[in-house]
Amino acid sequence: MAKKSLIYREKKRQKLEKKYHLIRRSSKKEISEIPSLSEKWKIHGKLQSPPRNSAPTRLHRRCFSTGRPRANYRDFGLSGHILREMVQACLLPGATRSSW
């Protein structure tokens, strides 16, 4: 189980990303449309004004049940070992074990 402080930190980052998403998107669109380099630098400064934690690259997917940040399966939102346990216990409908 991940520390609760790390899980709360991740939730805080998600809120910040959602809050500043439109500002970032509009600034990037302005940069792509303007041909002048000096104006691009001004807009680039505006793009750096939001907090660092509002950047989408700082977000991590976490396991829904344990909060583990690695080995997550997007389709289920679970880490690998929890996914395996749930499939073996038949708790995930439609998921089957592979054999070859």
Swiss-Prot record:
Belongs to the universal ribosomal protein uS14 family. Part of the 30S ribosomal subunit. Keywords: Chloroplast, Plastid, Ribonucleoprotein, Ribosomal protein, RNA-binding, rRNA-binding. The lineage of its organism: Eukaryota, Viridiplantae, Streptophyta, Embryophyta, Tracheophyta. GO terms for biological process: translation. Gene3D superfamilies: 1.10.287.1480. It is found in: Plastid, Chloroplast. One of its GO terms (cellular component) is chloroplast. HAMAP family: Ribosomal_uS14_1. It holds the Pfam family Ribosomal_S14. PROSITE patterns: RIBOSOMAL_S14. Binds 16S rRNA, required for the assembly of 30S particles. It comes from the Eukaryota. This is Small ribosomal subunit protein uS14c. InterPro entries: Ribosomal_uS14, Ribosomal_uS14_bac/plastid, Ribosomal_uS14_CS. One of its GO terms (molecular function) is structural constituent of ribosome.
